[in-house]
Amino acid sequence: MLKIAFDKSYRHPLDEKHRFPMIKYELIPEQLIRENTCNDSNFFIPGCIEDKNVLTTHEETYYRKLCDLKLTPKEARPIGFPMSKSLIKREKLISQGTIECVSNSLKNGVSMNIAGGTHHAFRDRAEAFCMLNDQAIGANFLLENNLASKILIIDLDVHQGNGTASIFNLDNRVFTISFHGKKNYPFHKEKSDIDVEFDDDTGDIEYLKRMDAVIPNICLLYTSPSPRDRTRSRMPSSA
């Protein structure tokens, strides 16, 4: 059964002039139900995350300052949201949602988190509406609990998953692929294992063609049961 992490707090209250489209976290569940992709029974409310599961990914000093609302103005400015306890609670809920989703996926094959994908959060700093990297936290949860020996992260957001790429740059257990706009944020990009960059106005056919040129081969290689010596070499962005 498809399990979907969602809580009403995912739509955090913001000033109506704020540029972040927070309403999408309310509209997505409504659309999924409207199109009969799922029903109310598919949704679950995440529990409370344990600090130890965050600290497999994030530097402790940063995490404590974040939770205590003690980031300096310079540290908080890249987040882009007004800081509050409820915002941090929401961020932790999202990360726990991804932990529960990856656990459900081991049983059911697939799960989703309505507000997941906080891929701009680095190990020791926040960036671009992302404070805790739920993808990295979920991956490390599986690895630390011996529920997986290697993880493949495929990021299809228009923005590069720079935080995720940085966090796993030296971890051979996690392979990162990012498909993103060449000229889009972040303007200084990190290096994923594979970065596939697109020009503005790329159409569906070209996008899918380049996905098909990368993903099947990587999935076949990376899920092979035989051990292999994977180097951290990168494919060119034109892959």
In which residue ranges do the predicted regions lie?
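Active-site rim loops that border cofactor/substrate pockets in soluble metabolic enzymes
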Residues: 192-213
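Hydrophobic alpha-helical segments, chiefly the membrane-spanning helices
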Residues: 235-239
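Conserved small/polar residues in nucleotide/adenosyl-binding loops
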Residues: 222-231
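Well-ordered alpha/beta subsegment
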Residues: 150-153, 158
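Short glycine-/acidic-enriched loop or helix-start segments at secondary-structure transitions
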Residues: 16, 123, 163-164, 233
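An acidic/histidine-cluster motif and surrounding catalytic segment
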Residues: 1-137, 141-148, 174, 181-184, ...
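Glycine-rich phosphate/diphosphate-binding loop of Rossmann-like nucleotide-binding domains
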Residues: 158-159, 165-193
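Glycine-/small-residue-rich active-site loops that bind phosphorylated ligands and cofactors
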Residues: 127, 159, 203
